[in-house]
């Protein structure tokens, strides 16, 4: 097999791209890139998905954001298919996900019917009903799955990503223990929650670190920079000084939600500034 030169060049830039977008998780990115590169080069087993990941860690540390950036880099926009598994906790909600025997497709089946390639993202997988966990055993072990509506689907063009907050309290409590020790504690808790045969089928199981103050600042700078650049392209020049920057960091990153509120905070703050400036310039 001789892979296309342009594909090799593209994959050569993958790790650098992800590192520029995701901060504070340098131990995660090389492991993720290894699986993605094998998948894109056709080196994964042909009877399995392109690759599979279990991302563990607190809310707002980059698990979902990393998945989004992987999808954006490899496939462009619109190739990530996200499922909030907390919506499928109860037995009567399982058919909404898997379909039912009458032939009515569920949400997963509808995605697989209309797409053949991309990333399937299952957020907070630990909250799903146990019947759905059984599906993951099948999904990770074979490139073809049959859902409750009796339809069979091909997953050989997809990456599967599951995120979980299992063990997050181990990472969030004040401690001087090294991260490797905390990581082992998280994985031990994972094994108390899921069956070993399910855990063992993921290509990579990675634990994300809580965000340090320096990392929080870096994330804020990235989000602000992206927004400022967008406004610049609209002909609006902005410069964020130190005092409002610190305010954005304090309000955009919380202990409970990590950096998840940052984009919304920056959008509101800078959007209000731009709105007032546009009004003063009589632009609307």
Regions found by a protein language model. Name each.
Residues 1-284:
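AAA+ P-loop NTPase nucleotide-binding core of proteostasis motors
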């Amino acid at each position: 097999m001789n892979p296309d030169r342009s594909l090799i060049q593209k994959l050569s830039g993958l790790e650098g791209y992800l590192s520029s977008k995701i901060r504070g998780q340098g131990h995660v990115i090389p492991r993720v890139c290894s699986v993605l590169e094998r998948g894109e080069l056709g080196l994964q087993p042909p009877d399995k998905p392109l690759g599979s990941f279990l991302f563990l860690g607190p809310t707002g540390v980059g698990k979902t954001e990393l998945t989004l950036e992987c999808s954006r880099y490899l496939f462009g926009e619109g190739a990530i298919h996200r499922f909030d598994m907390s919506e499928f906790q109860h037995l009567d909600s399982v058919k909404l996900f898997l379909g039912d025997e009458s032939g009515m497709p569920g949400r997963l089946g509808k995605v697989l019917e209309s797409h053949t390639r991309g990333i399937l993202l299952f957020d907070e997988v630990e909250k799903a009903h146990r019947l759905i966990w059984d599906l993951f055993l099948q999904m990770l072990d074979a490139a073809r799955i049959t859902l409750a509506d009796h339809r069979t689907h091909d997953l050989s063009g997809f990456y599967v990503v599951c995120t979980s907050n299992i063990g997050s309290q181990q990472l969030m409590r004040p401690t001087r223990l090294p991260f490797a020790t905390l990581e082992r504690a998280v994985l031990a808790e994972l094994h108390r929650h899921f069956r070993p045969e399910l855990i063992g089928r993921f290509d990579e199981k990675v634990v994300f670190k809580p965000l340090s103050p320096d990392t929080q600042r870096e994330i804020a700078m990235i989000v602000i920079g992206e927004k400022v650049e967008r406004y610049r392209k609209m002909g609006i020049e902005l410069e964020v000084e130190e005092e409002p920057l610190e305010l954005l960091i304090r309000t955009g990153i919380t202990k409970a939600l990590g950096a998840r509120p940052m984009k919304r905070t920056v959008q509101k703050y800078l959007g209000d500034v731009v709105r007032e400036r546009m009004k003063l310039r009589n632009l609307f």
